[in-house]
Amino acid sequence: MKKVTWLGMFLMIIAGCIGVEKESEIKVKNKMNISPELQDIIRMGTLAPSSHNAQMWKIKIVNESEILVLWDKNRKLESSDPQNREALISIGAFIENFVEGAKKYNYEVEVKSFNSFGEDNSVAKLILNKKEFTNTDNIIKNIEERHSVKTLFLKEDLKSKDISEILDINKSNVTYYDLESEKGKYLKESVYKAFEKEAIDKGVQDELAKWIRLSDKEAKEKKDGMSAEMMGMGGIKKYFYYPLVTEKTIKSNIFVNSGIKVAKKQTENCSGYLVVKSSSNSISDLIDTGRTMEKILLKANELKIAVHPMSAVLHVEPWKDEISGKLGLTEPVQMVLRVGYVKEYGEPTSLRRDIWDIIVE
């Protein structure tokens, strides 16, 4: 009888929490009265990539023409991103999607990045102004279809035309290194060695375990992190993956060593690496880097070039300190992207939160 009573109380508490959450959500929706157009623009913003799919962004709607973009401190990656460098880059990608998505509804977006975090952790202001745009279907298609590809790529040279189209996005900050070039070989080796070192770091393992989803139910509830599909475990593979994987197994030597072996194959099987640098590590420069990165990813989707961010080389010593010099660059490297053609380009599988999960009052 006692067990039943406690179970009943537990279910009532859970039901109560769900009820409060729904009431709160409805209240926010009704109170803010956001237009369907702005809702869709925000949704397209949320399709941006982020480390561990942590989705570190929030927004505050001042009015239909003015939006504040905030860093969500509750989604900070303490071990792999202690300085919030990648968080700001991800926010920049969110902003770029917002800017491009707004064209669908004939809005030009002025972006004003801040020099420091606001009291509410705001980092940028977006101002929407009416302006007519045409032929936006391809822009929206690329936003909707963009995704990271973590499979092995074909070891084929990128077409000169494709390289030029990508480099034209930002010639001063984007460089391509062919896999067989001297610097391409340095990147291949360094990206792998850095991943190997980072993979055995306990703090990084704990952080990774927090963001790996262990069931379809958890993935559906949290709407973030890495599901089986995002890790290449679709179909029959997922059927076996979820029952076998726990937080403990994620940190096991077998799991870690398996990841290291996969990383080695990934670094060796591609066309080369794109490197994105910035003038400094300021908030505005990192946001600009994120915007540049997203422009690259959207163009790559159009060209059907697979892209896989490989960030460990920018987290771990000695590589994070030496990479700019080794590549002959005088400014900080912010992103390293493995690129190449693939037999099957695939489709997006990333989890995404609803727009009402990221809007704050």
Please describe what each predicted stretch is:
Residues 5-13:
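Sec-dependent N-terminal signal peptides
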Residues 16-361:
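Acidic, surface-exposed loops and disordered segments
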